[in-house]
Amino acid sequence: MAAKSQPSAPKTKSTSGLTNGNAAAQGQWGRAWEVDWFSLASVIFLLLFAPFIVYYFIMACDQYGCSLTVPVADLATGRARLADIWARTPPVTAKAAQIYTAWVTLQVLLYMLLPDFCHKFLPGYVGGVQEGAVTPAGAVNKYEINGLQAWLLTHLLWFANAHLLGWFSPTIIFDNWIPLLWCANILGYTVSTFAMVKGYLFPTDARECKFTGNFFYNYMMGVEFNPRIGKWFDFKLFFNGRPGIVAWTLINLSFAAKQQELYGHVTNSMVLVNILQAIYVLDFFWNETWYLKTIDICHDHFGWYLGWGDCVWLPYLYTLQGLYLVYHPVQLPTYYALGVLLLGLLGYYIFRMTNHQKDLFRRTDGRCLIWGRKPKAIECSYTSADGQRHHSKLLVSGFWGVARHFNYTGDLMGSLAYCLACGGGHLLPYFYIIFMAILLTHRCLRDEHRCANKYGRDWEHYTAAVPYRLLPGIF
């Protein structure tokens, strides 16, 4: 399920008798070839309960004022039955299906038919046709980077409708939120199933497919590494960025419009949530080329985890703060609001500058200054699946000398700010920081396991130079 990543590479596995960093030569990349019992249990748990978790949170707001405990208490004491809760849940509607179909169609058209022009006039922005990382099969895929353009055009249409055209109400997303949930699930399951069938019958590159022999694991984690239709429609890039992340800011705007409609004003907490989350969304699309070197693209196969997660989990659970504020319009004291804003901006600064330092170091091959000094690095080497020897440098200067994943630390600070903007009245808006802490800690450990196998003894030298993962002096 989508989240901010750090530059990564295909996973490797240590094998006795192999030289340092040579495991990749044995085909150990991407997700696991074999499934242990814990991984299988985790996969089955997520397949069964992740859709229920999304439904429970949205239902709790719709029927119980965003309380997570009252529905359980009502069921436990007999004051409500599951059938009663389900009966009060809005079903899928023809209107919601039309809205969602139009939305996805628009994003596909913007992705496929409109080459990027933003890079021609925006200084510093890298768009247009770009190359990704070397794949396990030794290929270098090309991508049309036009996410920022799609975001700008989509929001231009949104504001033109709101202020000039009047084709639909700005509250249209909130007003159809649960019916749209069923549509998002249909797309999520459809694309995940199609991707699995494609991996078996007509993969883009059969050398980059993995089969464990376990249906549930293959479905969840994916079979194909880089599934594509034609030359340019890349499943990972499209579903990671569109339709979920482009929609993120539109969803928040619709929630703000609903707050205005219900109460006659928009609270400073809603403004904070819209601003802080919009900063992340814009950062994602401004740095979409950098995203090609992250874990999602360079490590994960495309399965239900990404397909359903990007269609359902991301747009519905990452926007809980705005949804909560529709039901509970919190007006924060000025000092508190400023504190939340500063926390969010500081977290973003750390997140962005940490990634910028690594990107600068890689682009210049170390011929640069970080914090006014020549950067230091640990020299590493590894072998890719095609047998070629590669050399890398692991940066140990700047923020990368503070902790090995300090970009995640900044990410968590920003995530906490989103939640703090909602005050302390309910647990529901704090789900995001809890989820992100678990997700990023898991990614941190997973990436370190992969790097330890990939770089071997060189990784030990790196961890000795930078001993902490996320929190200096603690973890």
Curated annotation (Swiss-Prot):
Region (Disordered): 1-21
Keywords associated with the record: Cholesterol biosynthesis, Cholesterol metabolism, Endoplasmic reticulum, Hydrolase, Lipid biosynthesis, Lipid metabolism, Membrane, NADP, Oxidoreductase, Phosphoprotein, Steroid biosynthesis, Steroid metabolism, Sterol biosynthesis, Sterol metabolism, Transmembrane, Transmembrane helix
GO CC, any one term: nuclear outer membrane
Membrane disposition: Multi-pass membrane protein
Annotated InterPro entries: ERG24_DHCR-like, Sterol_reductase_CS
Listed GO biological process terms: cholesterol biosynthetic process; cholesterol biosynthetic process via lathosterol; positive regulation of ferroptosis
Keyword match Transmembrane helix: yes
GO molecular function, one term: NADP binding
Subcellular location as annotated: Endoplasmic reticulum membrane
Catalytic activity: cholesterol + NADP(+) = 7-dehydrocholesterol + NADPH + H(+); 7-dehydrodesmosterol + NADPH + H(+) = desmosterol + NADP(+); 5,6alpha-epoxy-5alpha-cholestan-3beta-ol + H2O = 5alpha-cholestane-3beta,5,6beta-triol; 5,6beta-epoxy-5beta-cholestan-3beta-ol + H2O = 5alpha-cholestane-3beta,5,6beta-triol
Subunit structure: Interacts with DHCR24; this interaction regulates DHCR7 activity. Interacts with TMEM147.
EC number: 1.3.1.21, 3.3.2.11
Summary of the function given for this chain in its UniProt record: Oxidoreductase that catalyzes the last step of the cholesterol synthesis pathway, which transforms cholesta-5,7-dien-3beta-ol (7-dehydrocholesterol,7-DHC) into cholesterol by reducing the C7-C8 double bond of its sterol core. Can also metabolize cholesta-5,7,24-trien-3beta-ol (7-dehydrodemosterol, 7-DHD) to desmosterol, which is then metabolized by the Delta(24)-sterol reductase (DHCR24) to cholesterol.
Post-translational modification Phosphoserine, affected residues: S14
Pathway the protein contributes to: Steroid biosynthesis; cholesterol biosynthesis
Protein name: 7-dehydrocholesterol reductase
Ranges annotated as spanning the membrane: 40-60, 151-173, 178-200, 266-286, 306-326, 331-351, 420-440
Entry's family note: Belongs to the ERG4/ERG24 family.
Binding-site residues, NADP(+): K358, R362, L395, W400, N407, Y408, D447, C451, A452, N453, K454, Y455, Y462
Methyltransferase as UniProt keyword: no
A Pfam family reported for this protein in Swiss-Prot or TrEMBL: ERG4_ERG24
